[in-house]
Amino acid sequence: MASIFTRIIEGELPADFLWKDDACVAFLSNRPLRPGHTLVVPRAAADHWLDLEPELLAHLAATAQTIGIAQMAVFKPSKVGLMLVGLEVPHVHFHVVPIRGPHDLDFDNQDPNPDPAMMKAAGESLRQELRRLGAAGAL
């Protein structure tokens, strides 16, 4: 059975995409920890990050870094957190989260009903910044 991320990548489920390239996609989390919380997901499904080819893992990290640079410019957080957990969805994904402190990385703080206007504004601002940066996969 295809993971929820495979279904999003294939267009079966909606997502607010920020990035698409041949190896991965990035889209806003629908249960954000903070505004701008983005998921970086390889197109090829793998359950565990240790199963990824080193080149793909490096590409995911570089993409996450570029997303994080855009988040710093847009949201002005103290830091950008990066998590690779892999417990809820059997498809490797990086969480890239603009944070003020460690409490912002607690999944108990996810917003299950984020404000649609806030989500739209976050996506538009991040896409604009990624394009300004000249990021190859920016939409």
Regions found by a protein language model. Give the residues of each.
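HIT superfamily nucleotide-processing domains
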Residues: M1-L139
